């Protein structure tokens, strides 16, 4: 996998993870306003974005597992960072939304 291909996967991960992050934060605002159905829908949409980011990540890992040399890319590192922080945010959102539900 050449550097351009790795960089493209990095951009793909950044885009999907960024969309998921935005949806999760929007879900938190919906829960804050007691719009729990909307919050749950947004979390589901975020999960789809995360799944797409994970597919791109898995593609890269599979290539490396096959013994293919993977070019170094700051964009890919940035994408991995975005994905991991979004996964952490998703875990926190579950708990925060539940707290809003208990408080209403």
UniProtKB/Swiss-Prot annotation:
A Gene Ontology BP annotation from the UniProt entry: phosphoenolpyruvate-dependent sugar phosphotransferase system
Gene induction: Induced by lactose, galactose and galactose-6-P. Repressed by glucose.
Binding site for Mg(2+): 81
Location(s) in or outside the cell: Cytoplasm
UniProt keywords, alphabetically: Cytoplasm, Magnesium, Metal-binding, Phosphoprotein, Phosphotransferase system, Sugar transport, Transferase, Transport
Modified residues (Phosphohistidine): 78
Keyword check for Magnesium: yes
Active site per the UniProt annotation: 78
Domain PTS EIIA type-3: 1-102
Entry superkingdom: Bacteria
Gene Ontology CC annotations of this record: cytoplasm
Cofactor entry: Mg(2+)
The keyword DNA damage appears for this protein: no
GO MF annotation, one: transferase activity
Database matches in InterPro entries: PTS_IIA_lac/cel, PTS_IIA_lac/cel_sf
Function, in words: The phosphoenolpyruvate-dependent sugar phosphotransferase system (sugar PTS), a major carbohydrate active transport system, catalyzes the phosphorylation of incoming sugar substrates concomitantly with their translocation across the cell membrane. The enzyme II LacEF PTS system is involved in lactose transport.
Domain notes: The PTS EIIA type-3 domain is phosphorylated by phospho-HPr on a histidyl residue. Then, it transfers the phosphoryl group to the PTS EIIB type-3 domain.
Family annotation (PANTHER family): PHOSPHOTRANSFERASE SYSTEM SUGAR-SPECIFIC EII COMPONENT (PTHR34382:SF9), PTS SYSTEM N,N'-DIACETYLCHITOBIOSE-SPECIFIC EIIA COMPONENT (PTHR34382)
Self-association and partners: Homotrimer.
Name the UniProt record assigns to this protein: PTS system lactose-specific EIIA component
Species per Swiss-Prot/TrEMBL record: Staphylococcus epidermidis (strain ATCC 35984 / DSM 28319 / BCRC 17069 / CCUG 31568 / BM 3577 / RP62A)
Gene assigned in the entry: lacF
């Amino acid at each position: 996998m050449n550097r351009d291909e790795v960089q493209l996967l990095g951009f793909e991960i950044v885009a999907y993870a960024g969309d998921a992050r935005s949806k999760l934060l929007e879900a938190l605002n919906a829960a804050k306003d007691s719009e729990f159905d909307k919050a749950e829908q947004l979390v589901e949409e975020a999960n789809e974005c995360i799944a797409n980011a994970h597919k791109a990540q898995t593609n890269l890992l599979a290539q490396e597992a096959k013994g293919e040399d993977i070019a170094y890319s700051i964009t890919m590192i940035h994408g991995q960072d975005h994905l991991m922080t979004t996964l952490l945010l998703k875990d926190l959102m579950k708990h925060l939304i539940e707290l809003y539900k208990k408080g209403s």
